[in-house]
């Protein structure tokens, strides 16, 4: 079976390597069997493309409480289709509490506020692109500061346009 073979190969790359396994295959079939098999071989796993607490629950039923597992919940992509990822992540964190070897990851950050949401929920890991990190560094500005900066930006834009009335 190709995915298993690839996972075993990737695992040889180093001690800190986590092997990514999708929660389902391209046909939508849950990958519980391969997750269980690799987990029992003490291979560190990152179960990816997770969206629901129900999927997290199925993953938890397939693993032991020793081998390290990251459950990557695609919060940003859920938001992209109008779904609130927060309840699913909250439930997933609660379900995984008894598993000291499991970490919940907030994947596909779309805006700086996601960082605050992930932190408040108790996510163990959040993947943040550089463009969002730059914005997070601006946290703490007052609304008054933001207003002035915004209006200054409007002034600069209007001067650049050379538009006269």
Predicted features and spans:
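Active-site beta->alpha loop and helix N-cap motifs at the rims of alpha/beta catalytic domains
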Residues: 1-37, 41, 75-78
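Catalytic alpha/beta core domains of metabolic enzymes, predominantly
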Residues: 29, 41-134, 140-158
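A charged N-terminal "starter" segment
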Residues: 13, 156-164
């Amino acid at each position: 079976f190709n995915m298993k073979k690839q996972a075993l190969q990737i695992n040889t790359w180093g001690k800190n390597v986590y092997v990514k396994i999708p929660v389902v295959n391209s046909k939508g079939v849950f990958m519980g069997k391969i997750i269980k098999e690799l987990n029992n071989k003490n291979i560190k796993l990152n179960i990816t493309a997770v969206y629901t607490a129900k999927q997290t629950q199925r993953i938890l039923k397939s693993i032991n409480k020793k081998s390290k597992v990251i459950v990557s919940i695609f919060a940003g992509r859920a938001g992209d289709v109008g779904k609130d990822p927060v309840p699913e992540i909250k439930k997933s964190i609660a379900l995984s509490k008894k598993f000291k070897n499991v970490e919940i990851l907030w994947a596909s950050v779309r805006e700086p506020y996601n960082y605050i949401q992930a932190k408040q929920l108790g996510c163990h890991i959040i993947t943040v692109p550089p463009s969002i990190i730059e914005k997070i560094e601006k946290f703490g500005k007052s609304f008054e500061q933001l207003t002035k900066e915004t209006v200054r930006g409007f002034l600069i834009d209007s001067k650049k346009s050379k538009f006269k009335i």
